[in-house]
Design a protein with these regions (language model features):
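Juxtamembrane/disordered regions of integral membrane proteins
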Residues: 2-189
Length: 189
C-alpha cells in the first residue's frame, strides 16, 4: 500500500493538466458563444479560478484540504484584480495612443499575473518553481498576451477569452517544461 509523505514535494501531472485545460478552454469558448457580455474583472476572476482548479487537481500528492481551495480563490482574486487595475491604468497611459496603452497594460498584467501566480503556487501549494523558469514563463505569458491582442482584433467574437486561453497555455506549457526538466534531473531510484 502506498502512503503519502506529508512533506513530499508536489509534482504536476502534465497530461492530466492538459486534459483539464482543454476542457476548460472548451467551456470558455461555449460560454463566449452563449453570452459575450460579462464585466471584464468578473470574467478574469472566473478564468483565474478555472486555471487554478485545473492546476490544483493535477498535483500529486494531493494538496491539504485547505490549500487547493485557497489557491483557487487567490488565483481568482489575483486575476480579477489585475484585470481591474489594467482597466484603470489604460486611460492614464492612453496619451501615447490607445493601441500602445492597451499593449503595454496587457503585457504588464500578463507578466505580473505570471509572477504572482508563481508566488501563489510556491506559498499555497508548496510547488517549487525556481526564479529562472518563472521568469521564462512570465516572458512567455507576455508574448502570449500580445498574440492574443492580435487575435482579438482579427476575431472579436473570442473577446477577452483569447487573453486567458493563450496565457493559460503559455503558463501551463512552461510549468510542464520545467516539470519535465526536473524529471530528467531526478536521480533514478
Amino acid at each position: 500500500m502506498l502512503t503519502q509523505v506529508p512533506d513530499a514535494e508536489p509534482r504536476l501531472r502534465c497530461r492530466r493538466h492538459a486534459e483539464l485545460l482543454a476542457a476548460a478552454i472548451l467551456g470558455v469558448a461555449l460560454a463566449r458563444l452563449l453570452s459575450t457580455h460579462a464585466p471584464i474583472a468578473l470574467a478574469f476572476a472566473c478564468y483565474g479560478a478555472l486555471h487554478g482548479a485545473a492546476l490544483a487537481l493535477c498535483l500529486r500528492p494531493w494538496p491539504a484540504r485547505w490549500q487547493a481551495p485557497a489557491f483557487v480563490a487567490a488565483a481568482s482574486i489575483q486575476s480579477g484584480l489585475l484585470a481591474r487595475l489594467g482597466l484603470l491604468a489604460a486611460p492614464l497611459l492612453a496619451r501615447r495612443g490607445v493601441e500602445m496603452a492597451a499593449s503595454l497594460v496587457v503585457a504588464l498584467c500578463a507578466c505580473a499575473g505570471a509572477l504572482g501566480y508563481g508566488a501563489l503556487l510556491r506559498c499555497l501549494l508548496r510547488y517549487r518553481l525556481a526564479a529562472g523558469p518563472l521568469a521564462m514563463i512570465a516572458l512567455a505569458c507576455v508574448f502570449a498576451a500580445s498574440a492574443a491582442l492580435v487575435l482579438m482584433r482579427q476575431y472579436p467574437l473570442g473577446g477577452t477569452a483569447w487573453l486567458a486561453i493563450l496565457w493559460w497555455l503559455a503558463f501551463s506549457g512552461g510549468l510542464c517544461a520545467d516539470a519535465g526538466r526536473r524529471g530528467l534531473r531526478a536521480p533514478a531510484a
